[in-house]
Amino acid sequence: SHVYRSGINLYFTFACMPADASVMGDRYLESWDRALTATAEAGGGIAHHHGSGRLRRDYLHHDLGENGLALLRRVKQAIDPQGILNPGNLLPPADAD
């Protein structure tokens, strides 16, 4: 965890052991969704200095807003016009916005 003048950054680890191990992946993604949704609804940020990545990218609009997301998309297009640098990691597909 980190403390800044503007606030704090907390890290969490979630653990579960479902009776049916085949649902573990779904439970993992459900935990991410619940944690990120609750954080966004409380006004918290979801990416901090670690970036967004595939698990956080669909929640990035909570941090940046629609205008910020559009600006980030334009910057990404300017520096990576062919979309070859980590495709799908930073931004959700354009039709998902």
Task: Label the model's feature ranges.
Residues 1-97:
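Conserved glycine-rich FAD pyrophosphate-binding loop
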